[in-house]
Amino acid sequence: MMKRQFEDVTRIVIKIGTSSLVLPTGKINLEKIDQLAFVISSLMNKGKEVILVSSGAMGFGLDILKMEKRPTNLAKQQAVSSVGQVAMMSLYSQIFAHYQTNVSQILLTRDVVVFPESLANVTNAFESLISLGIVPIVNENDAVSVDEMDHATKFGDNDRLSAVVAGITKADLLIMLSDIDGLFDKNPTIYEDAQLRSHVAVITQEIIASAGGAGSKFGTGGMLSKIQSAQMVFENKGQMVLMNGANPRDILRVLEGQLLGTWFKQIEEVRHD
């Protein structure tokens, strides 16, 4: 029987999606953010190095500006995200401070990690922050990112961004929190007999074909982007856990080896009992 072993994991990237931070009503889930800050601070106190990739700028902005739905106009989307990013970081800073943990903000665009000079700079920034015991909180710089073909600077969504961050920081593990329990063999919202995949060693065409669907009205990510992120993690010889973010304390249980979520790790590196 395969056993998850995370004893040697030191550097962890945790990605949390908008659906985990914003309630269905559009209000901010303060309890969830507090639990997340507690878990990350606890890990830091145990000697772990944690980087948080956080969506939510759009959700926070919609809440602050009392908007019912995401604007369709790009400029307005960027404006809402810009307002929301400030509010989100302010809240993170306040709540993490309660646990005596300092945070910083890193906003990225895709071109930053494409060019060697800027990639070296951002890598050094991560290393400096981590060495100071600070939790870098990463998001895409939505206010300036564009996806036009002649000057594409968007990552697409924060699922992919988290995989990129895990790669450039050489993280031991990416934990992706979502509103789903993990990867199923078929759509659990349609098929009652859908089974959760505990371990995925190879991203097959069958898995890619079965993944799809849109994210929530507040976010952009779906299952396909999570599968693509796992593929990126595999290319960097890393590992990833996709799990439900309803209870952030489950992160601690996963690191203890409990079989929550779906573990993405290539088979040649898997240990057996």
UniProtKB/Swiss-Prot annotation:
Gene3D superfamilies: Acetylglutamate kinase-like. It is found in: Cytoplasm. Pfam families: AA_kinase. GO terms for cellular component: cytosol. PROSITE patterns: GLUTAMATE_5_KINASE (PS00902). It catalyses: L-glutamate + ATP = L-glutamyl 5-phosphate + ADP. Its EC number is 2.7.2.11. Its main location: cytoplasm. The keyword Nucleotide-binding applies. One of its GO terms (biological process) is L-proline biosynthetic process. Substrate binds at S55, D142, N158. Pathway: Amino-acid biosynthesis; L-proline biosynthesis; L-glutamate 5-semialdehyde from L-glutamate: step 1/2. Keywords: Amino-acid biosynthesis, ATP-binding, Cytoplasm, Kinase, Nucleotide-binding, Proline biosynthesis, Transferase. ATP binds at K15, S178, D179, T220, G221, G222, M223, L224, S225, K226. GO terms for molecular function: ATP binding; glutamate 5-kinase activity. Transmembrane segments: none annotated. The keyword Kinase applies. PANTHER family: GLUTAMATE 5-KINASE, ISOPENTENYL PHOSPHATE KINASE. Catalyzes the transfer of a phosphate group to glutamate to form L-glutamate 5-phosphate. This is Glutamate 5-kinase. It comes from Streptococcus pyogenes serotype M49 (strain NZ131).
